[in-house]
């Protein structure tokens, strides 16, 4: 059973059961590498296989509607080779780096995928996203820096700028639904992923930014308000 077959069969089943107009079929890819999406959408080995009953067709032609990526910002700051430099940063320096480098890096990925989605007539969505400040090892100093940054009011400002790029860095207008990872989770050595640190927490800089973003009108085709 090929990857294309495991893609095409569920698509056809869901559309038959629920109705084609109610199903959006999404292909996941790596945010930093458009090749992963382009290759999966084309499936050249399957397309050109002489034993393929659908020879000449691409994976995209089996019913793909959208590409999904996880355009996190700041993942490189947790790389082992970056640890000595980042560990020595103050919060001011870390936020300056996020603003000048980390968010623009993510915006560049969005821009490249916006072009790819536009060229292929597809939508672009986010299956995950947000900050990615997590160390590669048990480094207490690095962990404390990243946790403090996630609690700092300036992280809300970073999120405002980041979420604005989800639409602003896509001149072709392909971007749509953005999913943040995640809702509530304790911060620590394995990351500070939650918009909140626990379910009962009233708010946080990240949560407030995400709430503001969620209240803005949606702009993509087929979206519903209310």
Predicted regions and their residues:
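Substrate-binding cleft and catalytic face of glycoside hydrolase catalytic domains
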Residues: 1, 21, 25
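Aromatic- and acid-rich polysaccharide-binding/catalytic face
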Residues: 1, 50-101, 120, 131, ...
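Short, small-residue-biased leader/transition segments that mark boundaries at the very start
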Residues: 2-3, 7-9
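Short helix-capping segments at alpha-helix termini
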Residues: 14-20, 59-60
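Structural recognition of the beta-strand scaffold that forms the well-ordered cores
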Residues: 24-27, 65-69, 123-127, 176-180
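Substrate-binding cleft/loops of secretory-pathway carbohydrate-active enzymes
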Residues: 27-64, 68, 132-142, 187-197
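Catalytic-core region of carbohydrate-active enzymes that cleave or remodel glycosidic bonds
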Residues: 55-56, 100-129, 139-174
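Aromatic-rich peripheral "rim/lid" segments of glycoside hydrolase catalytic domains that contact
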Residues: 137-165, 174-226
């Amino acid at each position: 059973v090929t990857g294309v077959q495991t893609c095409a069969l569920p698509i056809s089943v869901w559309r038959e059961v629920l109705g084609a107009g109610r199903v959006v079929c999404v292909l996941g890819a790596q945010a930093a590498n458009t090749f992963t999406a382009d290759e999966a959408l084309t499936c050249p080995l399957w397309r050109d296989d002489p034993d393929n009953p659908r020879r000449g067709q691409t994976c995209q032609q089996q019913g793909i509607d959208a590409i999904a990526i996880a355009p996190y910002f700041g993942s490189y700051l947790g790389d082992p080779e970056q640890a000595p430099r980042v560990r020595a940063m103050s919060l001011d320096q870390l936020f300056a780096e996020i603003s000048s480098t980390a968010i623009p890096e993510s915006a560049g990925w969005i821009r490249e995928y916006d072009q790819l989605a536009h060229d292929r007539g597809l939508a672009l969505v986010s299956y995950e996203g947000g900050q990615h400040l997590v160390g590669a090892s048990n480094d207490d100093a690095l962990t404390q820096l990243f946790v403090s940054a996630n609690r700092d009011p300036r992280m809300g400002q970073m999120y405002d700028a980041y979420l604005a790029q989800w639409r602003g860095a896509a001149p072709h207008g392909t971007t749509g639904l953005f999913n943040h990872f995640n809702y509530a989770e304790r911060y620590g050595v394995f990351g500070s992923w939650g918009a909140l640190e626990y379910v009962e927490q009233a708010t946080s800089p990240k949560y407030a930014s995400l709430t503001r973003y969620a209240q803005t009108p949606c702009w993509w085709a087929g979206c519903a308000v209310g």
